[in-house]
């Protein structure tokens, strides 16, 4: 269920701010979004998997915290990230 090494490397390369950047909020939110989307597909087939659902809720909360941080720090980067990931309205 987790992202493969290749998928993770592709996401990091796409959202990094500079070479070697793996910890910026953009990269972290993009990785969490990919994991969340993958888990949503899992729940379509396994709707009673409550243990994994708790992990999904934790990921959603972590993503929300990172987005709140980025929104307070730099609204232009926040808006660009939301648009690229297709989150929100």
Curated annotation (Swiss-Prot):
Keyword Chaperone carried by entry: no
Domain of life: Bacteria
Keywords: Ribonucleoprotein, Ribosomal protein, RNA-binding, rRNA-binding
One Pfam entry name: Ribosomal_S15
An example Gene Ontology biological process: translation
A GO molecular-function annotation: rRNA binding
CDD domains in alphabetical order: Ribosomal_S15p_S13e
A cellular-component GO term for this protein: cytosolic small ribosomal subunit
SUPFAM superfamilies, sorted: S15/NS1 RNA-binding domain
Function, as annotated: One of the primary rRNA binding proteins, it binds directly to 16S rRNA where it helps nucleate assembly of the platform of the 30S subunit by binding and bridging several RNA helices of the 16S rRNA.
Database matches in HAMAP family: Ribosomal_uS15_B
Family: Belongs to the universal ribosomal protein uS15 family.
Protein name: Small ribosomal subunit protein uS15
Organism: Pseudomonas putida (strain ATCC 47054 / DSM 6125 / CFBP 8728 / NCIMB 11950 / KT2440)
Name of the encoding gene: rpsO
């Amino acid at each position: 269920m987790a992202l493969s090494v290749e998928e993770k490397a592709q996401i990091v390369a796409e959202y990094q701010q500079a070479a070697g950047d793996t910890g910026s909020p953009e990269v972290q939110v993009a990785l969490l979004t990919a994991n969340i989307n993958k888990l949503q597909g899992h729940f379509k087939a396994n709707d009673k998997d409550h243990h994994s659902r708790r992990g999904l809720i934790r990921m959603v909360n972590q993503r929300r915290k990172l987005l709140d941080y980025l929104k307070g720090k730099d609204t232009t980067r926040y808006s660009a990230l939301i648009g690229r990931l297709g989150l929100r309205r």
